[in-house]
Curated annotation (Swiss-Prot):
NCBIfam families: panB, PRK00311.1. It is an enzyme of class 2 (transferase). GO terms for cellular component: cytoplasm. It comes from the Bacteria. Its cofactor is Mg(2+). Keywords: Cytoplasm, Magnesium, Metal-binding, Pantothenate biosynthesis, Transferase. Its EC number is 2.1.2.11. This is 3-methyl-2-oxobutanoate hydroxymethyltransferase. It comes from Chlorobaculum parvum (strain DSM 263 / NCIMB 8327). The lineage of its organism: Bacteria, Pseudomonadati, Chlorobiota, Chlorobiia, Chlorobiales. InterPro entries: Pantoate_hydroxy_MeTrfase (IPR003700), Pyrv/PenolPyrv_kinase-like_dom (IPR015813), Pyrv_kinase-like_dom_sf (IPR040442).
Length: 277
C-alpha cells in the first residue's frame, strides 16, 4: 500500500508480523470501516486494521455478518485505505471476505480475493474456516495474496452453532481446531484469528505455529489481540461480552454533545456572532 504521508514509518507487512511473533512483541489490531476512524487508528499506533464483516452489524444494523456483500466490503475498505494513506501508512489493512464469497469453490475464492485486493490496494484478506477452505487459501496465496485465517467461533457459521458461546471446550472440537490451525499454516496463511476459545487451548495453538495468532476472547497467550472498535470505545451499549474491555464511554460523550447542540440551536445561542460571516 503506497504511503501518502510525509511522516513515513515502516509499513507493517506479513514479514513484520512474523518478526513480531519471533521477538515476543504483541500485535495490536482493531477494526475500522471508515476514513476518519482509520486515520485515528493509524496515527495511534495500531499494527493492523481489520475491515471486518462486523460492519454488517455495527455499521448497517444487521443481526449477523451474513448480509454484507463483496461490493460493500470494498466500499468500506477503500475508505479505510485512504485514511491510512492520509496518515503514517504504517498499519496493515486486512479485509474480511464476506459470507459466500469463497465457500462455493477455490476459483470463486480466488476471483473475489483478487477483486478485493485490486480495487483498493489493501494488504491481505481474511477467511473463516479450517480444512474445508484449505485449497482456497493455498490457491489465493499461490497467486500472491496474503490470507489471514479465522478459527474458533466463526460468525459466518452462527446458524450452524445456534449461539455465540465459547467454542472448542471439548476434546474433539479442540483437537480439530489444532489440526485446522496446522492446515491453514501449511496452506500459506500468514496469521490466524482465534475467537472465543479457552485461553489454554489458544496458548497451545499459538506455541504450535510459526505464524502469529490474533485473539478475540481467547486469552492473553495469543500473539496479538483484536477488538471491534465500536465495542472497545463504548459506542455499542447493548453488547458487552466478557472479553471486551471498554477503554471509553463514547456513547455517553456523543449523547451529551448532541443534547448540548440541540439545546443551543433551540435557544438560538448557536451560531454566535463569532461563528457567523
Amino acid at each position: 500500500m503506497p504511503n501518502g504521508s510525509a511522516n513515513k514509518l515502516p509499513h507493517v507487512t506479513t514479514r513484520r508480523m512474523l518478526d513480531m511473533k519471533e521477538r515476543g512483541e504483541k500485535i495490536a489490531v482493531l477494526t475500522a470501516y471508515d476514513y476518519t476512524m482509520a486515520r485515528i487508528l493509524d496515527r495511534s499506533g495500531v499494527d493492523a486494521i481489520l475491515v471486518g464483516d462486523s460492519a454488517s452489524n455495527v455499521f448497517s444494523g444487521h443481526n449477523t455478518t451474513l448480509p454484507i456483500t463483496v461490493d460493500e466490503m470494498i466500499y468500506h475498505a477503500k475508505a479505510v485505505v485512504r485514511g491510512v494513506q492520509a496518515e503514517t501508512s504504517r498499519a496493515m489493512v486486512i479485509v474480511d471476505m464476506p459470507f459466500m464469497s469463497y465457500q462455493l469453490s477455490p476459483e470463486d475464492a480466488v476471483r473475489n480475493a483478487g477483486k478485493i485486493m485490486k480495487e483498493h490496494e489493501c494488504d491481505a484478506v481474511k477467511m473463516e474456516g479450517g480444512k474445508v477452505i484449505a485449497e482456497a487459501v493455498k490457491r489465493i496465496t499461490d497467486i500472491g495474496i496474503p490470507v489471514m485465517g479465522h478459527l474458533g467461533l466463526m460468525p459466518q457459521s452462527i446458524y450452524k452453532y445456534g449461539s455465540y458461546k465459547v467454542r472448542a471446550k471439548e476434546g474433539d472440537e479442540a483437537e480439530q481446531l489444532m489440526e485446522d490451525a496446522r492446515i491453514l499454516e501449511e496452506s500459506g496463511a500468514f496469521a490466524i484469528v482465534l475467537e472465543k476459545i479457552p485461553s489454554k487451548l489458544a496458548g497451545e495453538v499459538s506455541r504450535s505455529l510459526t505464524i502469529p495468532t490474533i485473539g478475540i476472547g481467547a486469552g492473553p497467550e495469543c500473539d496479538g489481540q483484536v477488538l471491534v472498535i465500536n465495542d472497545m470505545l463504548g459506542l455499542n451499549t447493548e453488547f458487552h461480552p466478557r472479553f471486551v474491555r471498554r477503554y471509553a464511554d463514547l456513547s455517553s460523550v456523543i449523547e451529551k454533545a448532541v443534547q448540548s447542540y440541540v439545546a443551543d440551536v433551540r435557544a438560538n445561542s448557536f451560531p454566535s456572532e463569532d461563528e457567523s460571516y
